[in-house]
Amino acid sequence: MFSDLRKKFVFLTMSILIVVVLFLFAVSNRYNQYWDEYDAYRIVKLVAKNDYLGIPGDEPIALVTIDNQKMVKIQSNNTDLTNDVIEKSSLKLLEQGKKSRKWKSFIYSIKEYKDKTYTIAIMDLASYEVPYARRFLILVFTIFGFCLLAAVSLYLSRFIVGPVETEMTREKQFVSDASHELKTPIAAIRANVQVLEQQIPGNRYLDHVVSETKRMEFLIEDLLNLSRLDEKRSKVNFKKLNLSVLCQEVLLTYESLAYEEEKCLNDTIEDDVWIVGEESQIKQILIILLDNAIRHSLSKSAIQFSLKQARRKAILTISNPSAIYSKEVMDNLFERFYQAKDDHADSLSFGLGLSIAKAIVERHKGRIRAYQEKDQLRLEVQLPIDGFWTNTMIN
């Protein structure tokens, strides 16, 4: 978890940095391009005015004259272009007019005489391209710089994420220790109350205490399960499983429970859908989702359970009629101890069940999501099928 958080920090930092650098590079490049063109135009204007290529250096300039018959004569050519290209380009430039100063890769200046003859100075900006070796060197240094910054960001991320990691580790340890410490007194309370029930049968207060101690025991067990799931180094027993058979076994148990609640449980299960996972945890996912669907579906409604294989994944879907929940409720269904604050769901509370299901699914490299279609609440679980896993995916 924290390793992924550090990677996200580095990715975000480098993304922002790259965007800023590219923006500055684009602005700088446009600024330099403008002044390069300005300097080039100043030079060609001077050459055309003096009718003489007396500019020091190796500027790629061609000087041509055009008579009143549109005959082109090349006075000098210090570019990489052939004379034929210069002649044709000169006539094209003349058509552009004196007011223009750029055409394609050419910067030019035209001087017109009274006898309708012209002198044109042309500079080829393409010859100003940075040499290949220099461009390659710039690219190498840029890549090296970004790699260095990425390494520094990764190193610094340890100091940024470290305090959060320490605090969350302490919190998990506290939950685990507190849950273990509570198990014994809760069990003692329940045992004593059961003895009292035998001595004082039919006492509703004692019945209520027994009910609440059972609920506390379930809650403590859920907290311990979450603590174990959060600990990635805990041992797991992954093996090849027939998910179709597991679904049928769990459904058989819950059909009677659904009947007692006056609800119908319909299933569509594709045969021989194989996955790799821990059997007890996969069953726990099914139990949590079915229990959630039965408890939160509308009275006398039908719950749909389906399992199929598609896109190299086992797709498990449970849907049930429900109230229309707000986006806030749907976005927080998998949060621990989430209590809905919704007009249609004043008493809606999912406890730890869906949080545990999400943790198990993610441990199996899968994905779980909740969404609504009209009046149907759907929970969908996607797990990699057998054959798609690699040894490195099994922690």
UniProtKB/Swiss-Prot annotation:
Q: What is its EC number?
A: 2.7.13.3
Q: Name one Pfam family in it.
A: HisKA
The GO biological-process annotations, alphabetized, read as:
cellular response to phosphate starvation
Q: How does it sit in the membrane?
A: Multi-pass membrane protein
Name the keywords, alphabetized.
ATP-binding, Cell membrane, Kinase, Membrane, Nucleotide-binding, Phosphoprotein, Transferase, Transmembrane, Transmembrane helix, Two-component regulatory system
Q: Which residues carry this modification: Phosphohistidine?
A: 180
UniProt-listed InterPro entries: 2-comp_sensor_kinase, HATPase_C_sf, His_kinase_dom, HisK_dim/P_dom, HisK_dim/P_sf
Record domain Histidine kinase: where: 177-387
Q: Which SUPFAM superfamilies match?
A: ATPase domain of HSP90 chaperone/DNA topoisomerase II/histidine kinase, Homodimeric domain of signal transducing histidine kinase
Superkingdom of origin: Bacteria
Name where it's found: Cell membrane
PROSITE patterns given in the database record: HIS_KIN
List cellular component terms (GO): plasma membrane
Keyword Phosphoprotein appears in the UniProt entry: yes
MF-aspect GO terms: ATP binding; phosphoprotein phosphatase activity; phosphorelay sensor kinase activity
Briefly, what is this protein's role? Answer: Member of the two-component regulatory system DltS/DltR. Regulates the expression of the dlt operon. Probably phosphorylates DltR.
Name this protein carries in UniProt = Sensor protein DltS
Q: Which organism is it from?
A: Streptococcus agalactiae serotype V (strain ATCC BAA-611 / 2603 V/R)
In the UniProt record, the gene name given for this protein reads dltS
